[in-house]
């Protein structure tokens, strides 16, 4: 960044903002880069400002019982704020004085007053000087106030961030990220813009008093008629404002519904295409858009009347002020002109400045109070510790996540009693408040000596993470004692990476020790990974470490914890993302050897780790189930240990599976003194596990990648969803967010008893900060969010490091920091995260305007209609002027002219009544025309917005995946939320305002030019100067605005990153470093914003200077060239003053239109995306010349009838090559094989080898070359939709959209209820659907959060059965399933798809056994394609993956199927829980 010229600028340069000239020149000539921006003055740096405010706030906290943030702000900024307020007032006073001089000038032309004629020229000079003084006072004052507003915002931003880092975990659970971002963005932006208006709260009343005094002198009591009308008008506008808010609130709900479905569609676009649901989704979204647009139109009409009321009020104010006086006493022209000028200023003060100022104060004080409350929230306290202590001790420790739960618990119980809940009802329910009453840990005791390893195991949600939080001081014990030495290092369960290099992430502010660093890297197996990067350990990781795989992130997090020299190491499930082999090696080399003499507490679920630990603590529902050594465990709890030991290769399971089994086992053995309990009782019992939910609610412990939150299980009455629903003041969303749950708990919930919680389920929930820290991100819940699975930017990772999940969720993989807003509040969030879809020019092109205008044929007619009405108004005025000029002199025909719509006012001394009748008649006609000029325009522009939305939606749905893969989900969603909101709300009225203002100016210039042709000569250069100046300024200002938006994103991204790693930050004491980083991000944004404000002021001042010159010219031309007659001079000068303020407004309005039209440019960019249907897939020859031949798709006769093709499901694949994006690396190369009808083929390969990619290629979702035939029909001889309908798909990431069960199973409404129920029976879904009220009409929300992962898989299965597909593609259907659901899916597959071709990508051995052929993919190619016997005989991947004992088990299958074309699948014995095993290769 360059040094700012401001530092060396002279006073004159600062006054006229000339110091910004170099940047304006540069921006006009070339594209601005960040390096071109000037550094901020030291007075504006976040460090200085935050220190100043923090000091005053601390003083306030220390000195008072009720500290007020406004007092601290006052002490920091009051005097400068007052100084600029006085300048502003003096500038405004000049406005009030100008009409006096105008009156004197007009009076000097009265034939009876020749004595004053000689001083007219001096009065003219005085009038011009007032304009110059006003310009020199107002602009520095407004800029100064904007500057103070900016400084206040920066100081408060910093204070909020510092406070966030100190908040206790209890408080963090009550605040959602959405609220925090809203606190920073929404509330604080009010200061930037609003502070300039704040002073009008006292300036406007003073101005009104002064003006009323001056008008009283002219018109006596009748002056108050005009004022009365203005006050009534202001109240009328307030009423309209309230009505508008009502419509907007109603509309917000509709927008929400549309955006929820749109976001679900965008996030699951791959599934939408695979299912051929494009038309169904389009129809669904368009229907929601229709109802939304009805309310949009109502709100727009109200806003239109509100806006036009201001324009049309000018005539009435003058009319009502003058009429009573004229009727009683008659009137002279000088008074009328002076009154008109006074009334223009008066109207501005009463209807605009004062209401805006009141609104600003209301908003600002509200924001300050919110921030004040936030700054007084409870902070976390580090535990008191003793450095001489060597052991770690916990004595009788009990802890709650909530405080004050007792009272709430009582209230909930009382409420339940009132509802007369029967005790013997099997469907027990608990409210979220009963959860509050459950301690997360109770009576925990243990003691470990220095150098010992304590392994903590337990059921899902038993309190394992909470135990570590207690030791770190994040959770305060309500009773009991904790002792340790205080030097702690911590590794979080969810690996957290800060922006920076790998080295910085590991050292993390601790002093650098080369030997220690190398040892740690070796022990954590990072050497090989680091060597792959060209920059080695200096490679920079973006937000969230996006260039890394989950395993690499986990190892870096562990390395960070190990590198710090501490007495106690807390390791919270550090091996979650690692494969079995790596985990074993790291456990040995790192935990057992490198840290052998350190005290370690390891949360784990592996038997091997328990065996090696010095002590074991097993937790269940917050209590200690067992504490002691492994041998004691075998002696004291023989049932439990033998149960776990009885699993073959328990440690080989994925961590999710292990936890599922562990939870179930603990449940069974912990009931009623370990007495044997029947399965049905276990089912019942599972509803009582409030402890599990209580802990789960907070920590989402052992959450899988796609974890979701469940509601409390409740009785069938929807009202009882929350125990104390009606009486609680706490908002509903707060309580609903409390219970996160993960897929792994599924095995525990009885399959049939997911009770529905009624319509209230549809209330939006939001995610607390604490949930986000523990990664519990809801599926499909948030609008501004990506899937958690894809936290890595895949395009940057070497191909070998891609995980299956990466590849499958490729299109969402490039998001940054958007998984954050759980309440859909796009107003708060849309501005916070900049999406870099900004490859559009800095200024909107004419082509965009032309396309926009011609989009709807009526729009051109409406614009012509506006012009015709305008010409009628000007013509009427000119006719009246012509009549006036030809009136005999003795009648003293005089005329006045009202500001806005060219109404001519004729009043004579002799026939006041008669003339007023004519005047009112003409004015009313023009008024009616004027009113209806705008309505058709606003109506038509909203229709244009509707067309744009429809075209864009269609384009996105029809775009090829290769195009969508290059876009961010957040970027696409911003088009549908932010840009469509601009097209609906802001653009129509801004265009109307601009056209209105432009016509007023043209009309005024026309009238003045008719009266005094010389003045026309002065207006031509003025308008030319204004057009050139605007073009010059726009180039730079739009680029600065763009840079400012880009600069805003890092602030919020940093906030989110800090919150995710807050526990790590605090454990390592790195808060000061992160505050510095935050201040850097703030300063970068400030530099852009300050420069934007300065250039804007430069522009406004130049415009004002041009008008001052114009006014001087007009004044002297009219004074020197006009002969007798007050009328002409009066009209000319009044209009010239008018032209000045209106044209400035018009210029600003034109800049607004240009900014808003950028949204239209972005929407057009999406509309112009290529479509999928036209993409040939044959071989490269077909489209070498880049031209797409429509002739290529020839309707194939076999496909004419849906029931004929495909009949058998035979597939032939020839030379298939697949890429994600055009010109990218080939993920699969020259794949060739064939599949017989009805055959089952298993895909094998390492993670990231391209198994899921192959399935996507079959569906033509990728850029493919080569050929595939199904039953002899080639894929480029039929349409894309027909091809995809041949396949049934069960993807890894299940897509459930917001809608009824029926809609989810059959979005095109092709099947009757009877057929749907029949299929539901086949796949085992009937019992699930029947649990819900409304059955098939029950509405699923939030990605089907009330369904388990298994139920969702069954939904996919049902869709495939309904589609009558002959080929079924399964992508890891059992990834997160418990044994029970898995059996249901296996059974359904055997029955419903007995004669279908099945292609299976799976990690479980027993699922693979049912396949006749196996395709082994390695290094993007087919390595082997053989039967299971051949694979077991050779040295293949499959053989390596299976242990010797398993091979012995499998032999019977091998031998029996040797000579059969197809084994008897039905004869395979059902697997028991113990036989489930993973084959992650």
Curated annotation (Swiss-Prot):
Database matches in Gene3D superfamilies = ABC transporter type 1, transmembrane domain, P-loop containing nucleotide triphosphate hydrolases
Q: Which residues carry this modification: Phosphoserine?
A: 549, 660, 670, 686, 700, 712, 737, 753, 768, 790, 795, 813, 1445, 1457
Q: Subcellular location, in the record's words?
A: Apical cell membrane; Early endosome membrane; Cell membrane; Recycling endosome membrane
**Which residues take part in binding ATP 1?**
401, 434, 458-465, 493
The first-level EC class reads isomerase
Domain ABC transmembrane type-1, which positions?
A: 81-365, 859-1155
Report a single Gene Ontology molecular function: chloride transmembrane transporter activity
Keywords recorded for this protein, A-Z: ATP-binding, Cell membrane, Chloride, Chloride channel, Endoplasmic reticulum, Endosome, Glycoprotein, Ion channel, Ion transport, Isomerase, Isopeptide bond, Lipoprotein, Membrane, Nucleotide-binding, Nucleus, Palmitate, Phosphoprotein, Repeat, Transmembrane, Transmembrane helix, Transport, Ubl conjugation
Spell out the SUPFAM superfamilies in the cross-references: ABC transporter transmembrane region, P-loop containing nucleoside triphosphate hydrolases
Principal place of residence = membrane
Glycan attachment points: 894, 900, 909
Q: Which SMART domains match?
A: AAA (SM00382)
Please list where the region (Disordered) is annotated.
1453-1481
For this chain the motif PDZ-binding maps to: 1479-1481
**Cross-link Glycyl lysine isopeptide (Lys-Gly) (interchain with G-Cter in ubiquitin): located at?**
688
Q: Extract the ranges annotated as region (Disordered R region).
A: 654-831
Region Interaction with GORASP2: which residues? 1387-1481
State the superkingdom.
Answer: Eukaryota
**Which residue windows does the record flag with biased composition (Acidic residues)?**
1471-1481
**Topology of this chain in the membrane:** Multi-pass membrane protein
Record has DNA-binding as a keyword: no
EC nos: 5.6.1.6
Question: Disulphide bridges in this chain?
Answer: none
Q: What is known of its domains?
A: Binds and hydrolyzes ATP via the two cytoplasmic ABC transporter nucleotide-binding domains. The two ATP-binding domains interact with each other, forming a head-to-tail dimer. Normal ATPase activity requires interaction between the two domains. The first ABC transporter nucleotide-binding domain has no ATPase activity by itself.
Q: What does this protein do?
A: Epithelial ion channel that plays an important role in the regulation of epithelial ion and water transport and fluid homeostasis. Mediates the transport of chloride ions across the cell membrane. Possesses an intrinsic ATPase activity and utilizes ATP to gate its channel; the passive flow of anions through the channel is gated by cycles of ATP binding and hydrolysis by the ATP-binding domains. The ion channel is also permeable to HCO(3)(-); selectivity depends on the extracellular chloride concentration.
This chain belongs to the protein called Cystic fibrosis transmembrane conductance regulator
Which species is listed as the source?
Callithrix jacchus (White-tufted-ear marmoset)
